[in-house]
């Protein structure tokens, strides 16, 4: 954590230990990852300070991820087969207060469940990959409820519904803007079946390799339309009106 402690210096106060405790709790033995379980797993942590850190501490997630992405790029980026991997993940929840939670399909469980959904971007090379960006999906009915968004403390500029395809494309553009070096974008059929998404990736000067539906029709060569050969038979006689 020492390499990232500068991100947790808030108004002259160092809260990096709370960040370390929270991270240790997320990686801990308890299945549930609420603050009570995290505090139980990390008994030396300060519960009240940990709650303050998670709820109100104004450290910048974006600045932290920029540093993480830059370090990952130095290891996995800039190679001929460096690729940006797009995928989704679900986080099962019990209540209805977590940002973006609703009953929706959870790919991890293969069924509908009360959960959050996120779109993730990883920089990969061969068998190695590391997270460089992520977006939390905000369902439309959440975006249409200012009171719910206010209660959940969602920043005003993020209180809009965007499709997962839009979130993914935004992360591809952000990765390029941050200087990450990759030539390929990889994703599953949720993205590969969108002609618009594939075309937008190609417009960014990138190659893509994505899963497609079993029913998808593709050309194995550039199709060239041609005129049909003229028929030897004479057409229908003209009709006089």
Can you name each region flagged by the protein language model?
Residues 55-138, 150:
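Active-site-proximal, Lys/Arg-enriched surface segment
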Residues 105, 109, 140-142, 195, ...:
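Solvent-exposed, flexible loop/coil residues
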């Amino acid at each position: 954590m020492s390499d990232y402690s500068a991100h947790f210096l808030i108004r002259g106060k160092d809260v990096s230990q709370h960040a370390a405790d929270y991270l240790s709790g997320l990686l801990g033995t308890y299945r549930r990852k609420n603050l009570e379980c995290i505090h139980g797993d990390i008994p030396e942590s300060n519960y009240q300070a940990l709650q303050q850190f998670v709820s109100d501490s104004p450290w910048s997630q974006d600045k932290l991820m920029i540093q993480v992405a830059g370090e990952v790029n130095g290891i996995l980026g800039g190679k001929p087969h460096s690729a940006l991997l797009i995928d989704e993940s679900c986080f099962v929840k019990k209540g209805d207060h977590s940002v973006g939670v609703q009953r929706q399909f959870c790919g991890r469980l293969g069924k509908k469940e009360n959960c959050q959904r996120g779109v993730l971007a990883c920089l990969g090379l061969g068998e190695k990959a590391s997270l460089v960006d992520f977006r939390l999906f905000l369902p439309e009915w959440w975006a249409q409820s200012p009171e719910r968004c206010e209660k959940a403390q969602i920043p005003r500029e993020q209180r809009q519904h965007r499709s997962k395809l839009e979130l993914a494309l935004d992360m591809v553009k952000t990765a390029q803007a941050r200087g990450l070096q990759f030539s390929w974008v990889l994703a599953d059929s949720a993205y590969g079946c969108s002609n618009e998404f594939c075309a937008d990736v190609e417009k960014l000067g990138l190659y893509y390799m994505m899963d497609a539906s079993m029913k998808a029709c593709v050309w194995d060569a550039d199709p060239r339309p041609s005129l049909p050969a003229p028929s030897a038979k004479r057409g229908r006689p003209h009709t006089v009106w």
